[in-house]
């Protein structure tokens, strides 16, 4: 179905708004993907904070003008599916990688993040990025580990001064119960 001018302007405005908020973009070739596969991918995209859209390349190209994804405009050729990560940079990569496992017709073509374009092989790198929660957990572990190690060292020194060997103290109750 052909779009009239006002509908095209709405699509461009919607995509431009999404592109301005997005962390990363993956354009993937989807020709040959079944309706069931596409529906499952769209459902998963909604659940993971990925905006997924099939749109004419000229409209997508106009929508990304003035955003960090403008660098990918020259590679927007052929039937493409656009996946914008709205919450986490790696979400679109994980979505496309997961969907491609069960669909050999789905192939990433362009990966854009931070104003740079990467080859399709970088989808795996993008997909392996930790989620926000995982990154915060890693940061918390890195920040608390020195304090934890210091506390263990102080406790070991105190235990050694109070009664000698900590391992021997732990073995005594086991011997009494036998």
Curated annotation (Swiss-Prot):
GO terms for biological process: translation. One of its GO terms (molecular function) is large ribosomal subunit rRNA binding. Pfam families: Ribosomal_L10 (PF00466). It comes from the Bacteria. The keyword rRNA-binding applies. One of its GO terms (cellular component) is ribosome. Gene3D superfamilies: 3.30.70.1730, 6.10.250.2350. NCBIfam families: PRK00099.1-1 (NF000955). Part of the ribosomal stalk of the 50S ribosomal subunit. The N-terminus interacts with L11 and the large rRNA to form the base of the stalk. The C-terminus forms an elongated spine to which L12 dimers bind in a sequential fashion forming a multimeric L10(L12)X complex. Forms part of the ribosomal stalk, playing a central role in the interaction of the ribosome with GTP-bound translation factors. This is Large ribosomal subunit protein uL10. The lineage of its organism: Bacteria, Pseudomonadati, Pseudomonadota, Gammaproteobacteria, Lysobacterales. The gene is rplJ.
